[in-house]
Amino acid sequence: MQSSTLRQILLITDGCSNKGTDPAAMAALAREQGITVNVIGVMENDTIDESGMREIEAIAAAGGGVSQIVYSQALSQTVQMVTRKAMTTTIQGVVNKELKQILGRNSSIEELPPDKRGEIVEVVDELSEISELEVLVLVDTSASMKHKLPTVKESLIDLSISLNARIGNNRFSVFIFPGKKNDVEKLLDWTPKLDSLSKIFSKLTPGGITPTGPALSEALRYFEKKRSLRSMLGNDEQYYEDSI
């Protein structure tokens, strides 16, 4: 089985969206396009709004990804865990799909004999190590996120360091919502490292509403733009299709 490119959206927020399209619907659209949507809800003072929590879970479920509610001080390890878990889940889904084609509709990794299952798990681990990864990060910069942004910045830098220890190539892009003039603003174009976030984040002025749906919509457009450009240049890539 050949390695392909894993595509993820990582949404970091602390509450409920209050403008624009339904974010869960946009996450479902992302899943249809082979993009996994992971959501991390950042808590403060032991609480997170109940409607916000429901929305976080709904977005991740619709996007075939992982959701996690976390205190800001545990954000760094959570960002890494969620990203890696989603990678493994996507690859397992693809492997299960291939097993069904080879062995029949009811076959899956869990139903294989222990020795064969061990071999498949090794394949999944290897693919997680060598597959290319594209992560588009959406950071909520509404007013309530003001004191959490320094932690978000450090967590994303730690994420790029951790993932760059893999063999496979990584590309990250960072968008914020709301932006200065629009609902969404690109902060950082595709790059293998996120070190430059230190300077960029220090200039951010959090405030305003939480247009999560429009932010996800813009993320999809950005992925499609990248894919179209590669196709036009004759360098189209293989992408993992969501098979979960």
Predicted ranges, named:
Residues Q2-L6, T13-A62, V70, Y240:
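VWA/integrin I-like adhesion module and closely mimicked acidic/polar interface patches used
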Residues C16, S142, K146, S202-P206:
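Second-shell loop/turn segments in exported
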Residues T47-E57, R171-K203, Y222-F223, S228-M232:
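Short beta-strand-loop
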Residues V66-L75:
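Short acidic-hydrophobic, aromatic-tinged amphipathic segments that line or gate anion-handling sites
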